Amino acid sequence: MRRRTFVASGLGLITAAASQGLVWTFKAGAVSAQPADKPIAPPQGKWIRLAALPRAVGELLGVAVNGKLVASQGLLPGFKPAGLVYEYDPAGDAWKEKKPMPHPVHHAAVAGLNSKMYLFGGFDLPPSGPPGWNPVNDAWEYDPAADAWKALTPMPTTRGGAVAAVVGGKLYVIGGAGPVPNAGSPTIRPRQPQQSLGTVEEYDPATNKWRARAAMPTPCNHPGCEAVNGKIYVIGGRLSGAFIIGYPGNTNLVQAYDPGADSWVTKTPMPTARSGLNTATLNGIVYAAGGEMQDQQVLAAYRAFEAYDPVSDTWWQLPSMLLPRHECIMAAIGNRIHVAGGAVQSAIVPLPKGLAFETDAHEAFEVST
């Protein structure tokens, strides 16, 4: 068997790409990409186009609730939160605008539980001074059927760019970003000191109370996150500040949290190191789509579409998305992995009049096996 091994150092960042059909495994600080003797069958499917969003908006995030796709947030020029809420009905392939968020934010963590969408933290505009990202600790419950919002007990920690997942009827908010200690201002701005967080906080909807849990070993923001079989998988993300500009640090780490044991372990890294990606789970398989990267020469969003099997700790590279995008709506409904909206390149720069990098495009990976 021909084996290719990529030795990782430091945090184990792997930037080399593997061709389709290879199985990625992690052993003693090395990642091996190799044809398997008895390969686990990767998911099969195709990309299809579906009804576009009512408008092109970046930084919308979504969850599946009662067979529909519920999306919220959005980010406008000048770091202004859009506060949008949309609902997509796959039966009619149609979007509907819903009641806006009571307190518009962007980069809030979202999760679905018991026919509701929960939203935690995020960033709003600072009350004064130049535009920036002001982290908040808001917690909200949204009922799509009633089109109604309910304020919950705020999170103990103010942060944005975190992720959330559900295990055992409780919600876990993980990671995120905020100012460094003694920064003098809670607001973060590009190229100013800021930090990633490893904070983990558990919310119990039955009691409307929070409690702190074991911190994530490698703090990050803008990762993907899914819960499968009682474990939470935090995938990729940004190791430095919240902004992609001026803060390199995309990772392919996969950090798995067991709420029952309140402990963390590291799993096989994702083939593509990226942040601003989105994730969804279908039939026990985690799908990771898109993301962004930036250096002095490239302002890029990814078309990468990869799948992870937590049982075998195996990654596959699947057919790429039709469009590159990051920070988009993503959720599984039926046999489809929906992705919609987002931005098709990575940038926090003023754009010439008439030029936009957000998209209203909506596509889905239709899983056949």
Question: Where are the model-predicted features located?
Answer:
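Kelch-like beta-propeller repeat domains
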Residues: R2-I14, G21-T369
